[in-house]
Amino acid sequence: MNEQVRSILAQETTKTSKIRQLFLLGVPRAEIARMVTNGNYGFVVNALRRMREREGGLNIHPATAALDYTFNRKFGIEIEAYNCSRERLARELREAGIEVTVESYNHTTRPHWKLVTDSSINGNDTFELVSPILVGEAGLRELEKVCWVLDLCEVKVNESCGLHVHIDAAGFSMETWRNLALSYKHLEPVIDRFMPASRRDNYYCRGLGHVSDGMIRSARTVDELKGRIGDRYHKVNLEAYSRHKTVEFRQHSG
């Protein structure tokens, strides 16, 4: 199989053709992404979906066919930055087709993007850009467009800026919640190593090391687990579930 893979990768053909051949050979999607698209997993998923639609389904192993890797979960994002007035950024976003309003600080979920103030951010022309509820790959494409506008406006980040991601958790079982807390707690030292120092022991994104495994495993409700972890200023924020039915990951830097 290794020889077949090398032969496919050496072909002077399109990425899509290589993806198709490797997939039919049984190579996992993540590995295909690593070999063909420099890790762009979404490109691989989209290419395979287009092929299924065009060819009426690929001739693949039944066990593989039963798996659906389409990203369709709801999510939201909060981007903290500075060096661009909220008014100018709003104009640029609207010109790019992004609906956005300029507001004072609030926790209300809007059907559009909002630019709000945040007293925790240092710098000139600080802002927090908060998304509406985004869904799946269409949401990722909209987020990508927003990031292009941020680059255009030359926004900056510093150690006071964070990037917060909300993931829809409405369907989580209690087992999923416990596994999530345990996994993050045990992987926290690894995650810390690729985060800047300002995001490792930050008041606004504290760790889970103070909660014992036993305390996590014995929690019977989300509220009970939330009470054992603490307030919303933790790397994994369970308080978001009460307000938005999401789990919030707060550790990443701006």
Which functions belong to the PLM regions below?
Residues 1-15:
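Basic, amphipathic alpha-helix used for nucleic-acid engagement in HTH/winged-helix/SANT-Myb modules
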Residues 14, 51-52:
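Short acidic, low-complexity intrinsically disordered linear motifs used
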Residues 11-27:
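Short, amphipathic alpha-helical "recognition" segments used to contact nucleic acids or chromatin
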Residues 30, 34-49:
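Short, basic interhelical loop/turn and adjoining N-cap
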Residues 31, 42, 53-156, 170-254:
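C-terminal accessory/tail domains of diverse enzymes
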Residues 25-35, 162-164:
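Short, charged amphipathic recognition helices of the HTH superfamily
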